[in-house]
A protein has these predicted regions:
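Membrane-interface helix-loop-helix junctions at boundaries between adjacent transmembrane segments
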Residues: 64-138
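Surface-exposed, glycine/proline- and aromatic-rich loop segments on solvent-exposed faces
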Residues: 331-394, 453-474, 479
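A cross-kingdom signal targeting lumenal/periplasmic-facing segments of multi-pass membrane
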Residues: 362-437, 446, 621-626
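Accessory, solvent-exposed terminal regions and/or long lumenal/extracellular loops of proteins
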Residues: 307, 311-321, 408-412, 464-704, ...
């Protein structure tokens, strides 16, 4: 009890103690519970750099060395939570900018920018190698932390809870008003307001008492301005991280508000009781600086390497494993997008119809019909895969080169015309354009009222589900058009096309999204969507739902090699992944440079295939097939592919999918590994230990498969059979001793 009382006294002695505690808990939860891509090395570099720069800044300013340690720790923990980068130098730069800006950018003795916010915005402007993942928290997971933080803000005399409350109220009012104007169900704004990024910003960034106006009236005005700016960035500019941009733009006006509405300036409790000393003689400071210098020196070694994968490719889990599976290829660079839509429609062509909201008007030249085999090739290339290894003779002495290859292998691991026009006008529907492209008749529609559009579509033979009017109305108020396609049977017969081909549309818009909601009206159960994003910079992720990597590089029993078993296993494993995430996640199944693969489930796409999919930035090098590359080729590659798998329904995905491109070029494959044991004779002492390890591995594989799929461990063990045993000795000779290894210098000069 004494320890609890002591901790409570420490927690309530200074508002910063509550922030440090909560940020530390959030970081532990994010890294351990949500699988954030933040390494211990990045956290160590960030914290050490922040403390070191604070120590230097205090000395330069002539302040007590220990005065700013807590603030520096808060800034560094916030950066660990929000900043994503694979380069430790940029992590250090972010911490240096955050803390250094407090000393360098000051007006009237007060630093202008929130340290963490300023550093994040600076890095987003300076490099593609750093990014922020606003969807990493998901929706709902942070609610408990939000309430806890609100309680801490009151109990710990933060004196800035008015900023948080004003921002929360202002932004929530704008989001709810927008939903009411669009006619969206309340699930849409609620999902938006449940975002962990939103709550984290409200409680830990905009509430910084050292960078907000001194007067209460000024703080409320400031918070409302940031809320309005964030809403503008999100809903008018269609850019992620609107909170960060809005706060950065509003911060320079804080000195103006302080001059117009003067009040007593906030000061931390004095004296500041601190166990964090920034005295150079302090062991903590010395350890921090040593950590920083060591991490920077070893950064390239700490960063993950692209190792070769030397297993044998066995099988893949392509889209044919799932019913109701649609495929979309998104080629994106800047605001330019080429979307390829491949439907799994299997009925009569005369029954086919497609209605897709599009963000802008579309001309004939922007529409194309693609070849289905190219999409199938992309699906095969990016599909989760099954690979296998064969153990070598445990009695053989591996050469140094073979040992190195084995280490690498273990490391690496998408009516009349006049009457018709009159009727369209009465329903508020305008046919902006009509085209015939390949085997499709295509209309580009705009509308002024959802009920009129719904009526027009039904009267013209399009089977629109009842209740679609509400969703159509939301898209109409967002000034979106409707891309409507049906099959021209005469053209299909003339072209000799038996299977409907994918439709491609090229357009330019800041909206990087996929409209899902219209397809969920009266949908018969969850639907599968595969998104293949082809980009220049790096991996694509969702900004409004959590993007979760498949569990990969796990060893499973060898009997799963049978294609039917692998199909069954992968379906069950994906079902389990979806359930574990509450049905609200987007799953990353593949992320890799298009120039190579290791192992390859299919050859990389040729330059000509990429151009046909819409990759418009390729240079003018000769087109045609490329040899399959199993190692990265020299120089940067221009096409990075991300495969995302979504199982969606209206209950779990109330909003359309919104994406952004990150600077992350880390290679990732959904990969399952089979290990075949050596079954030869146990002709040496090492074999006894080897077969003991095989028995243990045999059990681990069964446990892993049970964990992945939820299947009964007893049934898995029964299918798996007994652990491999040594084979019989050859009948004509006794076991021979293994000769000692030859000295390396004898091999060198052949003596």
């Amino acid at each position: 009890m004494t320890m609890v009382n002591g901790f409570w006294r420490w927690l309530t002695a200074d508002p910063r103690h509550g922030q440090i505690t909560t940020l530390g808990l959030l970081l532990a939860y994010g890294a351990g519970g949500l699988g954030f891509d933040v390494s211990a090395a990045q956290c160590g570099v960030t914290v050490a750099t922040a403390l070191a720069v604070q120590w230097l800044g205090d000395g330069w300013r002539g302040a007590p060395r220990r005065s700013g340690a807590k603030s520096a720790l808060i800034s560094s923990l916030s950066l660990c939570l929000l900043l994503r980068t694979d380069d430790l130098a940029w992590a250090a730069a972010g911490a240096a900018i955050a803390v250094g800006s407090k000393f360098l950018i000051r007006v009237g003795g007060k630093h202008v920018f929130n340290p963490t916010n300023g550093a994040l915005v600076a890095l987003l402007l300076l490099t593609d190698a750093a990014w922020v993942s606003p969807g990493q928290w998901g929706a709902g997971a942070m609610a408990g932390f939000g309430f806890a933080s609100a309680g801490l803000a009151v109990v710990h005399r933060s004196a800035r809870s008015d900023v948080t409350l004003a921002f929360l109220a202002g932004y929530a009012a704008l989001v709810l008003a927008r939903a009411a104007w669009l006619g969206d169900p309340w699930a849409v704004p609620v999902h938006h307001l449940e975002s962990g990024a939103f709550l984290l910003f409200a409680f830990f960034m905009i509430s910084d008492p050292k960078t907000t106006p001194d007067s209460r009236a000024g703080r409320v005005l400031f918070a409302l301005a940031v809320a309005a700016g964030a809403a503008w960035v999100h809903f008018r500019l269609f850019r992620p991280n609107g909170f960060l941009w809005a706060l950065a733009c509003a911060s320079p006006f804080v000195p103006v508000l302080d001059r117009l509405l003067p009040a007593l300036r906030y000061a931390w409790p004095a004296p500041i009781p601190s166990s964090l000393s920034l005295d150079w003689r302090s062991p903590m400071i010395r350890r921090s600086v040593v950590t920083l210098l060591t991490a920077l020196a070893l950064g390239p070694g700490l960063a993950p390497r692209a190792e070769a994968f030397c297993g044998f490719y066995v099988s893949r889990a392509d889209t044919s494993l799932f019913n109701k599976a649609s495929q979309v290829v998104l080629v994106r660079d800047g605001d330019r997008t080429v979307i390829t839509m491949a439907s799994d429609f299997r009925g009569s062509p005369r029954e086919f119809a497609m209605v897709v909201p599009v963000p802008t008007a579309i001309t004939r030249e922007q529409i194309h019909v693609a070849d289905a085999p190219i999409v199938a090739h992309l699906d095969a290339y990016t599909a989760p895969r099954l690979v296998e290894y064969y153990d070598g003779n445990p009695c053989a002495v591996p050469s140094p080169a073979a040992a190195m290859d084995a280490a690498r292998a273990m490391g690496a691991m998408r009516q009349s015309v006049a009457e018709a026009l009159k009727r369209e006008k009465s329903l508020g529907v305008t046919i902006e354009a009509r085209y015939t492209v390949g085997e499709y008749d295509i209309l580009i529609l705009s509308a002024t009222q959802s009920s009129g559009l719904e009526t027009w579509l039904r009267e013209n033979g399009y089977r629109i589900p009842r209740g679609a009017s509400e969703v159509l109305g939301s898209y109409i108020r967002q000034q979106m058009r409707f891309f409507v396609a049906r099959v021209n049977l005469a053209e299909q017969a003339r072209l000799g096309v038996a299977t409907l081909r994918p439709i491609q549309v090229a357009y330019e818009s800041p909206k990087f999204m996929l409209p899902l909601r219209l397809g969920m009206v009266n949908a018969d159960g969850p639907q599968e969507l595969f998104v293949y994003a082809l980009t220049r910079k790096g991996r694509v992720e969702s900004t409004n739902y959590r993007t979760v990597k498949l569990r990969t590089d796990v060893e499973i029993p060898a009997y799963v090699k049978d294609p039917a078993e692998f199909t069954k296993m992968y379906r069950a494993a994906f079902d389990r992944h979806v359930a574990d995430e509450g049905g609200r996640a987007v799953f990353q199944e593949y992320a890799w440079d298009m120039a190579w693969c290791d192992p390859c489930a299919a050859d990389p796409l040729s330059r000509d295939e990429l151009r046909q999919l819409g990759v418009f930035w390729l240079d003018d090098a000769p087109a045609g097939p490329q040899p399959m590359a199993r190692r990265p080729v020299a120089g940067p590659q221009d096409v990075f592919v991300t495969r995302l798998h979504v199982r969606y329904d209206a209950a779990h995905f109330p909003e359309d999918l919104v994406f952004h491109e990150t600077g992350d070029r880390t290679n990732f494959q959904g990969r399952y590994v089979l290990r075949h044991a050596w079954t030869g004779p146990a002709a040496c002492p090492q074999a006894t230990a080897y077969y003991r390890q095989v028995a243990e591995r045999h059990e681990r594989e069964a446990q892993t498969l049970a964990s992945l799929t939820g299947w009964s461990i007893d049934e898995i063990r029964a299918r798996q059979g007994a652990s491999p045993r040594p084979g019989p000795e050859p009948p004509d000779r006794a076991p021979r001793p293994v000769p000692p290894p030859v000295a390396w210098w004898r091999q060198l000069w052949k003596r």
